Swiss-Prot record:
Extracellular topology ranges: 1-3, 62-69, 115-128, 184-185
Pfam families for this protein: MtN3_slv
Alphabetical keyword list: Membrane, Repeat, Sugar transport, Transmembrane, Transmembrane helix, Transport, Vacuole
Protein name as it appears in the record: Bidirectional sugar transporter SWEET16
Described purpose of this protein according to its UniProt entry: Mediates both low-affinity uptake and efflux of sugar across the vacuolar membrane. Regulates sugars homeostasis in leaves and roots by exporting/importing them through the tonoplast regarding metabolic demand. Acts as a vacuolar hexose transporter, such as glucose (Glc), fructose (Fru), and sucrose (Suc).
Disruption phenotype: Increased root sensitivity to high levels of fructose.
Length: 230
């Protein structure tokens, strides 16, 4: 069983890397068009926050080096995505986006890490408390792409709900859910089980709207901007 869980964990790491890399096409489009258009920033902000804390969890928890390395990679990738957003976001939305980034990607991680180190004296308690926080954030991470559903329904187009991000989040939830079952790890099972079902929901929505009529572009060839954050 230990060998099986190891191999499942390795597969999970590979899929996690694909999750972190899946938005590359989206951000290449943003760079080419020099506009964030109607893409949502919140999913990447949430994923950066989650990856940062999972990296810390992997560092302070014995035997979890794979968790820290893959999430360290994820934190780096998401940082690049967020910086690209900040560079191309319309001026009217720049300040609001910066405030959210500072609150969720700087202030909250510092408070969470400092709080667990202050309130819990032994390493096991600190690890468990951080695991609980990370599990909660994972649920947010899996659900954050749902913020794009309003845009999909309004425009009847899946252009701004990236398929590969939803697909790999679905796979990620499935494989890590199996891994959690093998190890009887509730911190992993609950968020990844929910991620599995949320992934199915997103894929069903994508399938429903994928043949819809393209949205109408303005005279400059760009879609009018809407708030990046709901």
């Amino acid at each position: 069983m230990a060998d099986l869980s190891f191999y499942v964990g390795v597969i999970g790491n590979v899929i996690s890397v694909l999750v972190f890399l899946s938005p590359v096409e989206t951000f290449w489009r943003i760079v080419q068009r020099r506009s964030t258009e109607e893409y949502e920033c919140f999913p990447y902000i949430c994923t950066l926050m989650s990856s940062s804390l999972w990296t810390y969890y992997g560092i302070v928890t014995p035997g979890e080096y794979l968790v820290s390395t893959v999430n360290g990679f994820g934190a780096l990738a998401e940082s690049i995505y967020v910086l690209i957003f900040l560079f191309f976001v319309p001026k009217s939305r720049f300040l609001k986006t910066v405030v959210v980034v500072l609150a969720l990607n700087v202030c909250f991680p510092v408070i969470a890490i400092a709080g667990t180190r202050t309130l819990f004296g032994d390493a096991n308690s600190r690890s468990s408390s951080m695991g609980f926080i990370c599990a909660t954030l994972n649920i947010i991470m899996y659900g954050s792409p749902l913020s794009a559903i309003k845009t999909v329904v309004t425009t009847r187009s899946v252009q701004f709900m990236p398929f590969w991000l939803s697909f790999f989040l679905f796979l990620n939830g499935a494989i890590w859910g199996v891994y959690a079952l093998l190890l009887h790890d509730m911190f992993l099972l609950v968020p990844n089980g929910m991620g599995f079902f949320l992934g199915i929901m997103q894929l069903l929505i994508y399938a429903y709207y994928r043949n819809a009529e393209p949205i109408v572009e303005d005279e400059e060839g760009l879609i009018p901007n809407q708030p990046l954050l709901a």
